[in-house]
Design a protein with these regions (language model features):
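Short Pro-Cys-Gly-centered "Cys-loop" motif that presents a nucleophilic cysteine in a tight turn
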Residues: 1-34, 42-265
Length: 265
């Protein structure tokens, strides 16, 4: 399996952190498996123009200090030559990659590909197809969806408990990973753990999540109805296309590796 090595999983976690910081998304949960990745995240809407200093800070988080310095010098050089229009256009090009789900996925894939190829020269395609997404509604559903993601290693037989796995949020946070801790902190700020559900209800819900394919809406009847009404011109049934729902709210994503890489050493 391509991701079987801890060094590759470490690169993937690094890429996820960099891409999230650059894109301005809130990651609440993740599980890096041997041949795919699950992420629960929120893409906050950007209501105001992102300040230039913030653009440079995020660019630095993704590309590193030297690249950010070169960008800043290029912007300053354009302005000194009286070409403020080009300078602003370049900043807007970078802003357009932020607070957007598809752009976040693209950024993440590119960053992981760069890190992976530094260790493992590989000319082929790493990822297979488009990512799959599910729009998640109320905190109750978000909490249970997170439980499903975190328990992936247990169902796969990789660990006896979620906390025992090093490459999901709870396990990485327990081992001191700062990014995983921030993910947990953000998640706890929007949902509160609850033990109100019986094991039977939890099991039924987890099976329901497992059966959901990309592009579905997961939430209460009212939430689903509201989303379908909001996109009534684009949605023909209760199964909403991924491209329709990816711009709003919470989403849970799983990315598959290309078939030929799933059994790679």
């Amino acid at each position: 399996m391509l991701l079987a090595k801890d060094s590759v999983k470490c690169d993937m976690l690094d890429a996820l952190e960099r891409a999230a910081e650059f894109s301005g998304v809130n990651v609440g949960s993740f599980a890096i498996m041997d041949n795919h990745l699950h992420v629960v995240l929120q893409v906050p809407a950007s209501t105001e123009t992102i300040p230039e200093r913030e653009v440079l800070r995020r660019y630095c988080a993704l590309m590193g200090g030297k690249a950010a310095l070169r960008l800043e010098e290029r912007i300053c050089g354009l302005r000194e030559r009286g070409d403020s229009t080009t300078a602003e256009a370049e900043l807007n090009r970078i802003r357009a990659r932020m607070h957007d789900l598809s752009q976040f996925v693209k950024t993440f894939k590119e960053e992981f590909g760069r890190l992976f190829r530094k260790r493992n020269p590989f000319p082929g395609t790493i990822w297979e197809g488009r990512f799959k997404s599910t729009l998640v509604g109320e905190a109750e559903y978000l909490r249970r969806c997170v439980a499903y993601v975190e328990s992936n290693p247990v169902r796969a037989g990789l660990s006896e408990c979620a906390e025992g796995y090093a490459w999901n949020t709870v396990g990485a946070a327990k081992r001191g990973n700062k990014f995983a801790k921030r993910c947990r902190e953000w998640l706890m700020s929007v949902i509160c753990p609850s033990d109100g559900d019986s094991p039977q209800i939890k099991n039924v819900f987890l099976k329901r999540i497992a059966q959901i394919s990309g592009g579905k809406i997961l939430g209460s009847a009212a939430f689903v109805s509201n989303m379908l009404l909001r996109f009534s011109d684009k949605v023909r049934s209760r199964s909403a296309a991924a491209r329709v729902v990816e711009a709003i709210g919470f989403a849970s994503h799983g990315w598959k590796l290309a078939a030929r890489l799933r059994v790679a050493a």
